[in-house]
C-alpha cells in the first residue's frame, strides 16, 4: 500500500467516528441512538458534529435508560433500519441484558428474523474511571448464541470492524477500549474497506510461544514480545479481533506451531474469554 492511498494518521477514536460517518452517508437506514450523543457529541466526542450534519432523526439523544434504548433499537432493526447504539460506558450494558440476550440474540432462532443492530460499548480500565466505569463485561455475553462480539486493538481494525458490524444482519456488540482512544494512531486507506468478522490476525510472528489476546492487551503483548525477544524468546502475538465467532483455525495453527500458549485478557480469570479458549485447546 503506497502513501498516496493512505489518509493522514488518525486516532483510534477518530477511526470509529469515521466509520460511523461513512456508513451513515453510504446507507440512509443507519442511524445513531444514545445518551448525550447529539448536541454534546457523546461522552468521548465520537459523534461530535453529527447532529448538525445528519439531523435529530438520525442522531437521537435518549433518556438514561439502557434497556429502553436497546429495546427501541431492536424494534427499529426488525423494521428494516440499522441502528447503532452508544452505550455510554460498557459497565451499564447490564441494564439492557434482557433485551440483548433474550430478544436481540434469539430472534434469529425464534422467527428467522434479522436484527441488524450494533451496540458500541466503551470498556476497560486505565482512564481513572473507577469501579463503575472500567469494567470488561464481554465475558457475560460470550455464551449467548445469536450475538457477535468484536474488540478491535488498532485504528485500522476499529474502523474496518465497525463498518463490517453495521453491514451485518446480526446483532453485534462492539467493545472499544477507552484506553486506546487517543493513545494510538495509524494512517488508514482512503478507499472503503471492512475487516471481516470472525477473522483473527497474527500481529507478530514467532516460533516459541503463542500469546493470544485482544483489545488493549494486544499492545501490552507486543511490548512483552519485544522485551522477551532480547532474551531469545520469540513470541507470536495473535489478536483475536472478533470474539464471536471465534477464529479457531488461526488459534490452532499458531499453537500447533509453537506448542506453548499464553492467554492474556483484561478481565476476571474465572469464566473469562481466556478460560474458554484454554478449554478449547485442551479439548482439541
Where are these regions (language model features)?
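Thiamine diphosphate
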Residues: 1-175, 180, ...
Amino acid at each position: 500500500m503506497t502513501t498516496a492511498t493512505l489518509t493522514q494518521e488518525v486516532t483510534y477514536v477518530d477511526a470509529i467516528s469515521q466509520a460511523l460517518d461513512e456508513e451513515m452517508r453510504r446507507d440512509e437506514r443507519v442511524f445513531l441512538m444514545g445518551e448525550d450523543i447529539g448536541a454534546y457529541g457523546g461522552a468521548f466526542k465520537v459523534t461530535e458534529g453529527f447532529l448538525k450534519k445528519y439531523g435529530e432523526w438520525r442522531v437521537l439523544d435518549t433518556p438514561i435508560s439502557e434497556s429502553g434504548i436497546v429495546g427501541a433499537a431492536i424494534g427499529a432493526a426488525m423494521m428494516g433500519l440499522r441502528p447503532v447504539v452508544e452505550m455510554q460506558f460498557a459497565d451499564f450494558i447490564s441494564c439492557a441484558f434482557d433485551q440483548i440476550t433474550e430478544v436481540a440474540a434469539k430472534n434469529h432462532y425464534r422467527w428467522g428474523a434479522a436484527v441488524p443492530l450494533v451496540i458500541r460499548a466503551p470498556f476497560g480500565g486505565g482512564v481513572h474511571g473507577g469501579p463503575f466505569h472500567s469494567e470488561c463485561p464481554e465475558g457475560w455475553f460470550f455464551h449467548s448464541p445469536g450475538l457477535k462480539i468484536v474488540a478491535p486493538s488498532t485504528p485500522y481494525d476499529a474502523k474496518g470492524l465497525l463498518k463490517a458490524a453495521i453491514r451485518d444482519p446480526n446483532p453485534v456488540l462492539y467493545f472499544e477500549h477507552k484506553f486506546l482512544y487517543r493513545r494510538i494512531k495509524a494512517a488508514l486507506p482512503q478507499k472503503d474497506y471492512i475487516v471481516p468478522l470472525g477473522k483473527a490476525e497474527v500481529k507478530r510472528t514467532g516460533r516459541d510461544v503463542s500469546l493470544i489476546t485482544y483489545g488493549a492487551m494486544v499492545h501490552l503483548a507486543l511490548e512483552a514480545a519485544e522485551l522477551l525477544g532480547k532474551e531469545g524468546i520469540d513470541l507470536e502475538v495473535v489478536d483475536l479481533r472478533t470474539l464471536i465467532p471465534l477464529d479457531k483455525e488461526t488459534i490452532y495453527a499458531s499453537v500447533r506451531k509453537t506448542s506453548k500458549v499464553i492467554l492474556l485478557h483484561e478481565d476476571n480469570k474465572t469464566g473469562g474469554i481466556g478460560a474458554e479458549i484454554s478449554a478449547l485447546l485442551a479439548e482439541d
